[in-house]
A protein has these predicted regions:
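Compact mixed alphabeta submodule
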Residues: 44-94
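Acidic, glycine-rich low-complexity segments with interspersed aromatic residues
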Residues: 1-49
Length: 94
């Protein structure tokens, strides 16, 4: 599950069946794309609201190939261009 490491750094997990070589994942590693970050409080939460957190960028050398339930998945750290608002940060992390 995605999680904040701080109010400006997010540890992100890709969708299942993604590898470091997947086109979708490769887009994170280039500055050709502007990354807009949206998040919901929890996958288990019945609330379907997404919160816009701002723009972000991939932190070099942070991507890792992992397995989840026997399926490939990629994790990486993303740095937000601006800190998440204090109240929104606590809403998403508490």
């Amino acid at each position: 599950e995605d999680r904040f490491l701080s109010d400006r750094i997010l540890h992100y997990y890709s969708k299942n069946n993604r590898k470091l070589t997947s086109k979708e994942v490769q887009k994170f590693f280039t500055d050709k794309y502007r990354l807009l970050l949206f998040m919901k409080k929890s996958d288990a939460d019945d609330n379907k609201d997404f919160y816009y957190l701002g723009t972000c960028s991939y932190i070099d050398s942070s991507a890792r190939q992992e397995n989840q339930d026997g399926k490939p998945i990629v994790s990486m750290n993303l740095r937000l261009d601006n800190r998440v608002n204090y109240h929104l940060y606590h809403l998403l992390t508490d």
